[in-house]
Amino acid sequence: IGRAVQQECRVYILDSRANLYSFSLNGKKEWVLDLAPILEKNQKTHHSGGIALNQENLFVATGFGEIFSIKLDGSINWKKRFDSPFRGAPIFSNNKIFVLNANDLAIALNKNGETIWTLQGATRPTLLSKGVSPAAKSNKLLLPFSAGQLKAVRPNNGAQIWKVAFDQSNKGEAYSIIGDFGGSPVIKSNKVFLVSSSGQLLALNLNSGRKIWSVLVGSNSTPVINGGSIFVVSTNGQLVRIDENNGEVIWSRNISGSTSSNEKFFGPTLAGNFLWITGTDGYLRKFDPSTGKEFSKHRIGNQILYRTYAVHDKLFIITKSGKIIAFD
């Protein structure tokens, strides 16, 4: 299941069979649209795909290699098929749709579904099927490829501005690659933050790609940045707070209270001035962003494989079985 998106009083979710759901905030299912190809109905895909939106349309990339433009009432404007599944959600920026497929092809489309440009990125076989998305700001489009390489390109034509990769610091360019992206790149002010599954968090200058700092923290989730701090759920089960400016670790807390836990954790999500973390142990945990202290934990009773989503004054949790639970 990909990341939920919200538009006014509706939440849209894409599942592993390419069913697109529209829910009201009170949990009422308004409509469902089966986007799977005819010959692949009821089959699960290993790639999550995802959803982007503007004021009028949803742009949905599926794990079956198709991308759709869909009105908010569920009617389809157009669809376009590509040769490879989409691992993550598209983004919509400057009236264009940008998305990466599992073969590391970056694709730019206009709102009518016409291809503007494509760019083949560095690729390698990976066991990770979770999706990451591009990011865009200040006439720069950031493309995270599965070989651990990030390219900054011009959104209008795909021309390269700079590129970097994990685990090398030769004057801002890098070619020694240790792992896939654990989360999507995040742009804050004039910095780019990116995290690898295999143990590195980098801060880069947005204009040049020059490395500002790095810290040995890996994650399978996109970091949260707030109030000068970066919050990361690490691959070894810790909630880590890092100084945004210099990369120093301010504190690190074991999420489960045990250093030997084999559980996996997802998040964090910042909502109501607290950090929320879900996990395969079936708990929703609430932490203080200032100190890392755990305030409470709620037993959900099902394995949770996704970070929680905050929409208005509600938290939404999706369990492994596909059940959606909302908290006020």
Regions found by a protein language model. Name each.
Residues 1-17:
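Beta-strand-rich domains and repeat architectures in extracellular enzymes and scaffolds
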Residues 24-28, 71-75, 110-114, 155-158, ...:
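Short loop/turn segments that connect beta-strands within beta-propeller blades
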Residues 229-241, 248, 252-286:
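Loop/turn-rich, solvent-exposed surfaces of beta-rich toroidal or solenoidal domains
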Residues 15-16, 62-63, 101-102, 145-146, ...:
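Structural signature of WD-repeat beta-propellers
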Residues 274, 279-322, 328:
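C-terminal closing repeat unit and adjoining cap/tail of repeat-based domains
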Residues 10-13, 21, 57-60, 97-99, ...:
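Conserved beta-propeller blade signature
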Residues 1-5, 30-52, 76-92, 115-138, ...:
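Extracytoplasmic beta-rich repeat domains
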